[in-house]
Structure formats: structure tokens, C-alpha cells
């Protein structure tokens, strides 16, 4: 039974194709599926390791959300579509040496690609990290401009 007819109005809205939100269609016309893959399932699907998947999520290559966004240890959830997008992601990823032998992939998304729920400016974060990195490794950093 619907209280005050509110829900049935929403149902009617969901049935109208011109209202993109209720049909889960993004501005770019992609159909968004509900978050349905666990991190392990995504790893199987992508044929990558768990640490790689987490790195992809942190660097913005793989879109994911936490099951409970309020808990930092909550398990990640993603979609097949996000996994496919991560695989098709242009491979102009920059190798950034972290100074202690760890090399991480960092990729900057253009603002046109930022989907709902992504960190506001991933590129700005990377720039901040890179400038911190430069301070840390000043003196032993090789300048690629000089031979």
C-alpha cells in the first residue's frame, strides 16, 4: 500500500524515459548498473591482484564505492562496466617513483570524465603529492632535460 501516493508518482517518473536519473543513465548516455561486484569478483574479472585493484581505485582508474561509505575499512564494491572502463582506460599512465623503490601508476582524469562520486580533483591531489615527492628527493633526482 502506498502512503499518500508518493511512491506511485516516483514509479511513474521511473517509467518515463526523459527523466535520466531514474533510469540510471549518466549525462554521457551510459547505462549505470548498480554496484554488484565485490573487490575479489572484480579482480577475477580483470585478472589482476587485489593490491593492483586497490591501487587502481586509489588512482581513479577503477571506479568503486565502499559498501558503507562512512567506514574506511568497509569492503569495496564496483561494477562490470567500471572494470571494462578501467581496462579500456588509455595507457598514458605516468610512472612516478615514490623515492623508496615503490613505483605507482598515477593517472589524471579530465574533468569531463569525472563521474558522480569520484574525488573532486584527482589531478590536484597527484600534483600535491608530486611536489611533496620533489621536496623529499631533491638532490638525488635526475633531470630528464639534461643528458
Curated annotation (Swiss-Prot):
Keywords: DNA recombination, DNA-binding, Viral genome excision. It comes from Shigella phage SfV. Excisionase and integrase are necessary for the excision of prophage from the host genome by site-specific recombination. GO terms for biological process: DNA recombination; provirus excision. One of its GO terms (molecular function) is DNA binding. InterPro entries: HTH_17. The keyword DNA-binding applies. The gene is xis. This is Excisionase. The keyword Iron does not apply. It holds the Pfam family HTH_17.
